[in-house]
């Protein structure tokens, strides 16, 4: 019973403590991200895999947390949602009729990105580094 009563106190202490996330991947520094692997999937058709260039993905993306943008060579996409946890940074937005999500590992900078619409999904894996 005593441990149950201490749970709210522990939760409050955790909520008020500073984030222990790696400083490079916590949203405090601009990042340059490079996609390395890609897959395009359509319902009932399976997935095609290849390098990101095969599917028209940019070679590099810059994440500007101050401006809340993911910037590529042709366009910039606003970051509509951002959530930090101990293990990852999650970003979300909408671009060209697709919903997108990006997850960046807080320790390594490895990333996974998805773009999805009613027809299928596009998945990219890669890595980010501080700019």
Could you describe each region identified by the protein language model?
Residues 27-67:
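Short, solvent-exposed loop/hinge segments that bridge or flank secondary-structure elements
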